[in-house]
C-alpha cells in the first residue's frame, strides 16, 4: 500500500462524511405510504367506474365498444333494452386482475360512462374478488363530465321525444342543402 492510496482513501472517507452531513437535514425522499398519501397526477389512470346522467340514469348504452377495444379482454357486458327504447347493460363485468389500466375503454366510450379515477388501491387476497360487477362500478354522480348527456347530443330519438326538440340539441342537418 502506497502513500498515494492512503491519501486517496482518507479523502474519500472525508468526502463521504461531508455528503452525509450536507443531506442530514434535508427532506426524506421515501414516503411512508399508508400514513402519507402519494401525489397522483390529475390524469392518473386508476380504478374504472361507471357514471350516471344528471337525471340519475345509467350513461352506459351497452354499445360494446369498450369490450372490443380492450387489449386484455377484461370487460364483458350484455345489452338489454328498456320500454322507452333506451339500451342499458343487463350485466357489466370488469376483471381487474387482468386489467392493465391503459384507458382505451374510456377513450372508446361514446357516452362518457366509463371513466378512470385516481384510485389504485385494488389489492385483494382472492383473485375472484377482483371481478367487479355493475353494482360495484356504478357511482351515483356524473364523474368528470357532469353536463354531458349522450341522448341529447347524438340525435338518437327516444319514444315520446323528437330529434331536435331539446334545448341543447341542434336540429338535424339536411345534407342536400350543403351541396353547391
UniProtKB/Swiss-Prot annotation:
Upper classification of the organism: Bacteria, Pseudomonadati, Pseudomonadota, Gammaproteobacteria, Enterobacterales
Xref: SUPFAM superfamilies: 4Fe-4S ferredoxins
Assigned GO CC terms: plasma membrane
Protein keywords: 4Fe-4S, Cell membrane, Iron, Iron-sulfur, Membrane, Metal-binding, NAD, Quinone, Repeat, Translocase, Ubiquinone
Pfam families for the chain: Fer4_7 (PF12838)
Principal place of residence: membrane
EC code(s) of this entry: 7.1.1.-
Domain of life according to the entry: Bacteria
Subcellular location: Cell membrane
Cleaved signal peptide residues: none
Gene Ontology terms describing biological process: aerobic respiration
GO molecular function, one term: quinone binding
4Fe-4S ferredoxin-type domain boundaries: 50-80, 90-119
Cofactor info, note text: Binds 2 [4Fe-4S] clusters per subunit.
Membrane topology recorded in Swiss-Prot or TrEMBL: Peripheral membrane protein
Protein name in the entry: NADH-quinone oxidoreductase subunit I
Cofactor(s) essential for the protein: [4Fe-4S] cluster
Family: Belongs to the complex I 23 kDa subunit family.
Annotated binding of [4Fe-4S] cluster 1, by residue: 60, 63, 66, 109
Reactions mediated catalytically: a quinone + NADH + 5 H(+)(in) = a quinol + NAD(+) + 4 H(+)(out)
Organism: Buchnera aphidicola subsp. Acyrthosiphon pisum (strain APS)
Annotated gene: nuoI
